[in-house]
A protein has these predicted regions:
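Active-site histidine-anchored catalytic micro-motif
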Residues: 3, 27, 44-47, 60-62, ...
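Fold-independent oxyanion-binding glycine-rich loops
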Residues: 8-10, 36, 68-71, 84-85, ...
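Extended low-complexity, polyampholyte segments enriched in Ser/Thr/Pro and acidic residues
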Residues: 261-263
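N-terminal glycine-/serine-/threonine-rich phosphate-binding loop
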Residues: 1-76
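Anionic-ligand-binding alpha/beta catalytic cores of soluble enzymes and soluble regulatory domains
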Residues: 117-191
Length: 273
């Protein structure tokens, strides 16, 4: 049975997601459908990629991921259908594909959406193309080869000999703050040295915890979460709200001076001794 995931920024307050599921089951009756989320930001691609990737990687190889984010940023004359690392991805041609994967896949076809004007008309063409692919196992049945895609890539931490600087990419519902520094990057750069995590100018953390319970209630902590990313939090509190931290916004960053407090608060720095 084929597994198809749905991810979007649409929400679930109206009929759209239900209609798309109906299209899938009417065309591919054996499909198993799984929702990843329908509450991604339409503007913060890096945050959306973090959420999507850390769910999608747990699905079996062969899964088809239909990702509908910022769908109408450009006129949708086509959507992309790509293969990467055993998984298949359907996305608008708006840069989100490369933001998710971090690379441009070698295998990409475009699904022709000309003549489709509404969201449901476009998803009907998507589902038909996915069905052709699943029946044949050949991506050429879904569309024609295509390489001239929109490309946007995730920001990476900035590195110096004795420091790292990461951007806040996600704040969860408990206002725990996730930074785009992965454990393997941290360990490689730290080389076992003592460190100091610095944020909002005067706040520091000098120990990595294994879980929230390792510090007293109301104390701040840092750890590498289940996705392997650096997370700073306050046990029983709200880190982002208490310390004025906010998600990194590249557009806002470009409008601000480097010494602007808000710009600083979107960064987290690690210094090594």
């Amino acid at each position: 049975m084929p597994v198809i995931t749905l991810t979007s920024d649409i929400g679930q307050e109206d009929f759209i997601i239900g209609a798309v599921k109906g299209q899938i089951l009417s065309t591919i009756p054996t499909a198993t459908i799984a929702d990843i989320t329908h509450y991604l930001s339409s503007k913060n691609y890096q945050q959306g990629a973090y959420i999507f990737n850390n769910a999608a990687k747990h699905f079996p190889k062969g899964t088809v991921h239909i990702v509908m984010v910022n769908f109408f940023q450009f006129p949708q004359e086509h959507v992309l259908f790509a293969h990467y690392n055993g998984h298949f991805f359907v996305t608008p041609d708006n840069g989100f594909l490369t933001m998710m994967l971090g690379v441009k896949p070698l295998e990409i076809v475009k699904i022709n959406c000309k003549g489709a004007h509404t969201f449901i008309q476009i998803t009907e063409k998507i589902v038909e193309s996915v069905a052709y692919f699943l029946a044949s196992g050949n991506m050429a049945e879904a569309g024609e080869p295509f390489t001239d895609i929109q490309e946007i890539y995730p920001m990476q931490p900035t590195l110096g000999p004795n420091w790292m600087e990461g951007q806040i990419l996600f704040i969860d519902q408990f206002e725990n703050v996730v930074v785009n520094i992965r454990k393997e990057e941290f360990d490689l750069h730290a080389k076992g040295r003592p460190f100091k995590i610095v944020f909002t100018r005067n706040e520091t953390i000098e120990v990595l915890s294994k879980h929230y319970g390792e510090v007293p209630v109301a104390d701040k902590l840092a750890w590498f979460n289940s996705a392997g990313y650096l997370e700073i939090a306050v046990r029983g509190g709200n880190m982002a709200g208490l310390f004025g931290l906010s998600k990194y916004d590249e557009n806002q960053h470009n409008k601000q001076r480097p010494n602007d407090n808000k710009w600083f608060f979107q960064m987290v720095r690690v210094f090594f001794e």
